[in-house]
């Protein structure tokens, strides 16, 4: 449409979350084909994609006219509700599903003076999404510097938790939070794998940049007494250890 936002994308499924009962009452009709109007999640993903493309163009020294600033302005006009400090689900809605606030924070286009309110909301709500969107929630909070809350959500219990999978005997990752939470739940599904990247990259601070000599910053809470993990990264092995109050990261060449 004229302001650059997407509406009535009928070429495929407008995925917000799955199963449907974990969309936090997202206030937009997600029928096939999609209903009339402009909704939040697909536009947040679109802006994220445009910003990623612009980053690649910069890295390649290509000349281009940035589109993302105008898209962010249009997104704010359509979905931001100053009376709550949150993003709404659709252009005409007053409801703010957690999904509608996870993605703007994750993709980094929430204005600096609005970030704390959005991050607080994600913490207050806890995990009320499916395993798919939980990845973006944890990553968004990490990018907002809320590492203690990330670790708490990652290791917490309840019906919507990875601990619930373990309590049900999981040896891999389920497609849903529990075997009976979806009628045909796969008991080995990669879209529940948020703990892998979040623990390694955001909590332990092990990234390719660190392996190449950048400053290493761990965000593992002091309450964790012992942890040891070996992570293959950038042609090396990163050995992370927390023991007796000491935290170390040793880079070993693969032999």
Model-derived features with residue positions:
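Sec-exported extracytoplasmic/periplasmic mature domains
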Residues: 55-58, 73-80, 142-143, 155-159, ...
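Generic structural signal for hydrophobic core residues of well-folded globular domains
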Residues: 107-110, 141, 203
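Non-catalytic C-terminal accessory modules of carbohydrate-active enzymes
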Residues: 73, 148-255
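The feature captures the catalytic groove of carbohydrate-active enzymes
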Residues: 2-67, 73, 80-134
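Repeat-solenoid scaffold signature
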Residues: 127-157
